[in-house]
Amino acid sequence: MSPKTETKASVGFKAGVKDYRLTYYTPEYQTKDTDILAAFRVTPQPGVPPEEAGAAVAAESSTGTWTTVWTDGLTSLDRYKGRCYDIEPVAGEETQFIAYVAYPLDLFEEGSVTNLFTSIVGNVFGFKALRALRLEDLRIPPAYSKTFQGPPHGIQVERDKLNKYGRPLLGCTIKPKLGLSAKNYGRAVYECLRGGLDFTKDDENVNSQPFMRWRDRFVFCAEAIYKAQAETGEIKGHYLNATAGTCEEMMKRAIFARELGVPIVMHDYLTGGFTANTSLAHYCRDNGLLLHIHRAMHAVIDRQRIHGMHFRVLAKALRMSGGDHIHAGTVVGKLEGERDVTLGFVDLLRDDFIEKDRSRGIYFTQDWVSMPGVLPVASGGIHVWHMPALTEIFGDDSVLQFGGGTLGHPWGNAPGAVANRVALEACVQARNEGRDLAREGNEVIREACKWSPELAAACEIWKEIKFEFDVIDRL
């Protein structure tokens, strides 16, 4: 090893401040299969060299501090330090670059997303030498991912539980999201499920407010589920939001949901926290509950291109922490999401092995080994005219969730659900017959309108609705 990067006790203690790059920039380093690898988009302050900025990120997110300390001599920092092992420019950006950092596995507690994030993104993002910093991607080695349970059940087990195959699942978020009484809320759930949906959903901020306490909502929703199941012969569910102010209260709500015999509960995993989410995921596996995950607050973290954390990192974290569904954008609706980038992290959620593909924002090959997959949920500003595109983009292993696109139907909730189910079945049949939904999708919907008045009414009311804005999240 070069003397410039030597940090063992034999060197002796020399007080003072030295450049991070002397210790933490190691371009000759060969990454190990057990290393956790990170790709950071770094924007240094003027005058800070890329090598120093990249090394500072590696140092401050692992063993380093701002000055040399004598206790460095009590351990082998070469074993534990993060290393900036490569730097590459960002096309079209003179002041930005990608710094690749390798972290030894021993830096992280097994089975703890909380500890992983506390180390890698917990402190370094406030570092003064950097104008901005964004974590673009992580490579989680099998040696670490195998310490996590992961999703409570996964895609195949969910399909077996629901006895539903060969198509996306259909959902609906009950609106208005706040203000309904528990009984009226349950009525809306029943009407949507009776009309043909597989799931209905609590909105992310429905917890236990004065107008509708959680226990009342759970009871009326369970009644709606059982009534709809009896009338349709299909298994139904409602995402009962167990998110609460304390972990103990969250678990109380999940336990009550299990006692009611419902199939699925819900958690806001970012506002609720990874420790709470992992605890709930373990309970759900042990007790046969599916777990729907909402990503409320994600855009605070991932919306800006130069600072924060890309959603693909949050998606990987969720797969480790545990969830059977997670919201993933729509590409075509009202919420942010560019197609190639979105499909990149959708594959990271669903597939076992994902190759590095920079055209889709995937910086590292990811091998999940045997960890179950997560169903991506497309939700936000979508309606029946979007059904062909959603079916083509997301494929069968997804949940397509229409809130206003169900409850906004001019004839009511049940006809809105009928319209969505008919549109989905028509698109799946057309695809299975070999038709190109990307090119013929509108024609498929128009043909289905001829024998479904509910779909025809929905198509008429939403024919002019579009959400066309420039996408922020580009490569």
Swiss-Prot record:
Note accompanying the cofactor annotation: Binds 1 Mg(2+) ion per subunit.
EC identifiers of the protein: 4.1.1.39
GO biological process entries: photorespiration; reductive pentose-phosphate cycle
Residues bearing PTM N-acetylproline: 3
Record InterPro entries: RuBisCO, RuBisCo_large_chain_AS, RuBisCO_lsu_C, RuBisCO_lsu_C_sf, RuBisCO_lsu_fd_N, RuBisCO_lsu_N_sf, RuBisCO_lsuI
Catalytic residues of the enzyme: 175, 294
Keyword line: Acetylation, Calvin cycle, Carbon dioxide fixation, Chloroplast, Disulfide bond, Lyase, Magnesium, Metal-binding, Methylation, Monooxygenase, Oxidoreductase, Photorespiration, Photosynthesis, Plastid
PROSITE patterns reported for this sequence: RUBISCO_LARGE (PS00157)
Entry-annotated residues carrying N6,N6,N6-trimethyllysine: 14
Any one GO molecular-function label of the UniProt entry: monooxygenase activity
A GO term from the CC aspect: chloroplast
Positions bearing N6-carboxylysine: 201
Annotated Mg(2+) binding sites: 201, 203-204
Main location: plastid
Functional note: RuBisCO catalyzes two reactions: the carboxylation of D-ribulose 1,5-bisphosphate, the primary event in carbon dioxide fixation, as well as the oxidative fragmentation of the pentose substrate in the photorespiration process. Both reactions occur simultaneously and in competition at the same active site.
Family designation: Belongs to the RuBisCO large chain family. Type I subfamily.
Other facts noted in the record for this chain: The basic functional RuBisCO is composed of a large chain homodimer in a 'head-to-tail' conformation. In form I RuBisCO this homodimer is arranged in a barrel-like tetramer with the small subunits forming a tetrameric 'cap' on each end of the 'barrel'.
Name of the protein described by the UniProt record: Ribulose bisphosphate carboxylase large chain
Source organism of this protein record: Pinus radiata
